[in-house]
Amino acid sequence: MEQTLSIIKPDSVGKAHIGEIIAIFEKSGLRIAAMKMVHLSVKEAEGFYVVHKERPFFQELVDFMISGPVVVMVLQGENAVARNRELMGATNPKEAAEGSIRALFGESIGVNAVHGSDSLENAAIEVSYFFAKTEVVNSVA
């Protein structure tokens, strides 16, 4: 079973969309193997998004991600990375498929409701950034 990291971003947490987003994941067959709500520090946000450090949007992304609490989850299931990315939709909500999380809850390319790992390799790195191995439960019976 694959695992991937999902973050419900401050905009969706603030608008009380947590339950709706989790329902989309669960209805698609993805299971939650770990979950917690955190308010990221500047250091944590910069560390998580270090791959974007040289990009022009980096500081705006960090500022947004520390603007309120986020819900960090490990999703598990067959093809979890690809399924999560399909459920999220395109980064820009205006280009996201109808019914996708970003089409439903995203506002803009920067304020786009959720983050999801883009590869199995990055999923492993991202999961370990937020969770110890003992915090991740095999949720598939």
Swiss-Prot record:
Catalytic reactions on record: a 2'-deoxyribonucleoside 5'-diphosphate + ATP = a 2'-deoxyribonucleoside 5'-triphosphate + ADP; a ribonucleoside 5'-diphosphate + ATP = a ribonucleoside 5'-triphosphate + ADP
Assigned EC number: 2.7.4.6
GO cellular component, as recorded: cytoplasm
Amino acids binding ATP: 9, 57, 85, 91, 102, 112
Subcellular location: Cytoplasm
Cofactor (UniProt): Mg(2+)
Keywords, in A-Z order: ATP-binding, Cytoplasm, Kinase, Magnesium, Metal-binding, Nucleotide metabolism, Nucleotide-binding, Phosphoprotein, Transferase
A GO BP annotation: CTP biosynthetic process
Gene3D superfamilies in the record: Nucleoside diphosphate kinase-like domain (3.30.70.141)
InterPro entries (alphabetical): NDK-like_dom (IPR034907), NDK-like_dom_sf (IPR036850), Nucleoside_diP_kinase (IPR001564), Nucleoside_diP_kinase_AS (IPR023005)
Top-rank taxon: Bacteria
GO molecular-function terms, A-Z: ATP binding; metal ion binding; nucleoside diphosphate kinase activity
Function field: Major role in the synthesis of nucleoside triphosphates other than ATP. The ATP gamma phosphate is transferred to the NDP beta phosphate via a ping-pong mechanism, using a phosphorylated active-site intermediate.
UniProt protein name: Nucleoside diphosphate kinase
